[in-house]
Amino acid sequence: MPDYAKKNLSEVEDSAVKHGFSETQIARFAGGDLGCERIGLALEGVKPGRRQAFGHRHEEDEEVYVILQGEGRMRLGEDLIEVGPLDAIRVAPGIMRAFEAGPDGLELLAFGTHHEGDGEIDPGFWED
């Protein structure tokens, strides 16, 4: 295997479909397709006017999110911030987070360190 890998993110399986969240979001986790061992990469999307179906956090992993298209909000613990194109947001381990899209939807890249099994999901994290 060469010392590099290339994959078009549109060709990566959408895990949101597989897990029943396709009504609200898109989640294409590319780390496995790229053969990543210590980092993770995902193309994520939130459909117009929708919110991710759950919040999540990591105990060890640090993540950076880069907004590619659209505007919306991101909840980080108890904080709520506005996000838009080319905003980069670093999230330290332990912080619960989720995105909400504006009327045009939201597309973003998520990347960071990766430790297998290091993730907690909270479906009730961001309720009205």
Where are these predicted regions, by residue range?
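Short beta-strand His + acidic residue motifs that chelate non-heme Fe in jelly-roll/DSBH
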Residues: 54, 74-75, 91, 97-103
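A generic "binding-loop/recognition-motif" signal
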Residues: 60, 79, 95, 104-105
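Short, conserved beta-strand element in jelly-roll/cupin
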Residues: 43-46, 57-75
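A short, N-terminal "cap"/entry segment at the start of jelly-roll beta-barrel domains
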Residues: 1-39, 119-128
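Short acidic-glycine-tyrosine-enriched beta hairpin
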Residues: 78-93
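Double-stranded beta-helix
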Residues: 98-128
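Conserved short histidine dyad/triad with adjacent acidic residue
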Residues: 23-29, 42-58
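Short histidine-centered beta-strand/loop micro-motifs
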Residues: 31-33, 52-58, 100-101, 124
